[in-house]
């Protein structure tokens, strides 16, 4: 009996403890559900008021052009009332004394998006100031241009200061040619009228030997004025009309020492192209022409094997008509001596 009583007592205590725990957990969840919306609302409200404060500060600095003078003063009063309410709820975002004393009449509203508080309020309009300043600058610039000394620019980087008329008239009184004229457009330090490969043109007669005219453009040494005196050196002076490879003109382009019209292999012209010492018309193998091509020392018409013509092709020293085995002709096929011995023997017996 006592054991059963103890078991029932333990079961009852466990059920009571579990019921109490569930009630406590339910109360905590309900309290959390009530406090979380309140905290979220305060956070959202603080964020919104922070944005309003920043927007007003930007408007006071004149960095937003969305607000204009056409707005009603009632809107400004509403904004100030919101700011005061936000200040009372959030003392950490409190304004300083100057901002607290600020009223709707003292609030500065920009009239232009480029308005700045640091600028002084002058009675002159900005457009008039800008026009007067531009006129002043243009006048000073025109005076500077009139007072500036005239100069001319040359392509080689030289500048000429002074009177332009004197430059256009010619050289200096002493005859020096340091100043170049404008109509002599040039490449580098040379005049365009004497475009050439070499040194630049000089006006003095002492430099005649170094002048190279365009009419005698050449590859080689330059042309001298005393060409007739040095005619013996004509191989060293080549004009454009005699462009060449070597020491002869282009009209006789050649391989060797003969003109192009006699192009050849060896010492004879192209018209007698040959293999050896005879012309091409007698192409041959050896010392005879092509018409007598042969194997040996006789012409092609008598092709042979040995020293006799092709018509007497033979094996040995006799003609083809007496083909034989050994030293006797085919008509007397035999195994023994030759026909000549038989003839000699018959003559001896007679």
From Swiss-Prot:
Residues 22-49, 115-140 are annotated as: Disordered. Myomodulins enhance the relaxation rate of electrically-induced contraction of the penis retractor muscle. Residues 1-22 form the signal peptide. Keywords: Amidation, Cleavage on pair of basic residues, Neuropeptide, Repeat, Secreted, Signal. Expressed in all ganglia of the CNS, but only in a subset of neurons. Transmembrane segments: none annotated. Residues 22-40, 120-136 have a biased composition (Polar residues). This is Myomodulin neuropeptides. InterPro entries: FMRFamide-related_np (IPR051041). Disulfide bonds: none annotated. It comes from the Eukaryota. Residues 23-53, 65-178, 201-210, 223-236, 339-350 form a propeptide. It is found in: Secreted. The modification Leucine amide is found at residues 61, 187, 197, 219, 245, 255, 265, 275, 285, 295, 305, 315, 325, 335. The keyword Lipid metabolism does not apply. GO terms for cellular component: extracellular region. GO terms for biological process: neuropeptide signaling pathway.
């Amino acid at each position: 009996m006592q054991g059963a009583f103890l078991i029932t007592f333990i079961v009852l205590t466990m059920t009571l403890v579990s019921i109490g725990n569930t009630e406590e957990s339910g109360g905590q969840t309900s309290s959390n559900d009530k406090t979380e919306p309140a905290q979220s609302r305060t956070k959202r409200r603080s964020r919104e008021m922070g944005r309003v404060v920043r927007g007003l500060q930007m408007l006071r600095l004149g960095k937003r052009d969305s607000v204009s003078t056409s707005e009603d003063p009632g809107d400004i009063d509403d904004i100030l009332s919101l700011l005061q309410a936000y200040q009372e709820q959030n003392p950490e975002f409190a304004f300083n004394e100057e901002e607290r004393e600020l009223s709707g009449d003292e609030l500065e509203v920009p009239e232009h998006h480029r308005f700045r508080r640091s600028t002084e309020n002058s009675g002159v309009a900005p457009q008039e100031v800008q026009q007067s300043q531009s006129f002043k600058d243009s006048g000073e610039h025109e005076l500077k241009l009139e007072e500036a000394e005239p100069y001319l620019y040359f392509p080689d980087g030289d500048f000429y200061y002074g009177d332009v008329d004197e430059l256009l008239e010619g050289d200096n009184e002493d005859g020096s040619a340091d100043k170049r004229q404008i109509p002599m457009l040039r490449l580098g330090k040379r005049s365009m009228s004497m475009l050439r490969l070499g040194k630049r043109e000089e006006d003095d007669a002492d430099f005649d030997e170094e002048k190279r005219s365009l009419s005698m453009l050449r590859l080689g040494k330059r042309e001298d004025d005393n060409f007739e005196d040095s005619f013996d050196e004509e191989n060293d002076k080549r004009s454009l009309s005699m462009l060449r490879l070597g020491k002869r003109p282009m009209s006789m382009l050649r391989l060797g020492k003969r003109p192009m019209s006699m192009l050849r292999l060896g010492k004879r012209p192209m018209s007698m192209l040959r293999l050896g010492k005879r012309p091409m018309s007698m192409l041959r193998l050896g010392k005879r022409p092509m018409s007598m091509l042969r194997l040996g020392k006789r012409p092609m018409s008598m092709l042979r094997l040995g020293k006799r013509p092709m018509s007497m092709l033979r094996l040995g020293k006799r003609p083809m008509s007496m083909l034989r085995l050994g030293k006797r002709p085919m008509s007397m096929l035999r195994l023994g001596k030759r026909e000549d011995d038989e003839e000699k023997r018959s003559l001896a017996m007679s």
